[in-house]
């Protein structure tokens, strides 16, 4: 019998959620996603030392200022890891903008353009890159600007329906609604486990997917942040799912039928008027889970970015 991973691939584009090139090569996903935490993890792998050295060499050629060298090294390291990953995936790499720019539209746009230029200078075209931005109002506005320039974006740390709706209305290429982190919040609050079909993260992504398809939005829905394969299988049929190596391994070892749960209705319901900033803030802030998890996610990515910078600073 075919494995659950093989069956899932027939229903959904499988993406690897890791910066570990060896793991990516093992599971042959279509795309790969990275974030500051995954770049930090990858930077600690011995085999990646030459990529760090090359990034430092690049940074030293750009500036004599040590603080600037640290920034440039981190950016180039993310790009160098992305370049290596693109040698083993046929599709796209997602590279994230510094989380400390999450509330700065202009800063996010500038950083995104810089990352794209680094990729372009290395011979990587825009159609192989997604720029990751936090799904704050400012991040969504940055994505709206970048999409018009031909720079596709992946809006991450998405926990509320308000965030999802605003992303679709801004015409962003792809969103990454988080499943496991939503479940974590409800599990802590209610003190119980959830069956996959009633998992609050699964319910959230299902609702977003159906809304997009009913209203004919082209924005790709890529479920992210999974805690178990039950959550993944409940979202079979979603446009894309980005999955960590340990869960890809579980899916590869599991057999049994995988049932398509999400189906594109190709709807053409009338779309509501685009949300205003005030409406977005009001709707998003009605969801205590989303408010807490978005803030926590930004803080944690910023902490790991700081750790990476501290590690790089010792090598300059």
Swiss-Prot record:
Q: Which SUPFAM superfamilies match?
A: Aldolase
Which reaction does this chain catalyze?
D-sedoheptulose 7-phosphate + D-glyceraldehyde 3-phosphate = D-erythrose 4-phosphate + beta-D-fructose 6-phosphate
Task: Please report the name of this protein according to its UniProt entry.
Answer: Transaldolase
An annotated Gene Ontology molecular function: transaldolase activity
List the Pfam families. Answer: TAL_FSA
Query: Which EC class is the enzyme in?
Result: transferase
Q: Where are the transmembrane segments?
A: none
**Summary of subunit composition and partner proteins:** Homodimer.
Recorded family membership: Belongs to the transaldolase family. Type 1 subfamily.
**Source organism of the structure:** Aliivibrio fischeri (strain ATCC 700601 / ES114)
Compartments, record wording? Cytoplasm
Record keywords, A-Z: Cytoplasm, Pentose shunt, Schiff base, Transferase
Per the record, the major location class is cytoplasm
What GO terms describe the biological role, i.e. biological process, of this protein? Answer: carbohydrate metabolic process; pentose-phosphate shunt
Active-site residues from the entry: 132 (schiff-base intermediate with substrate)
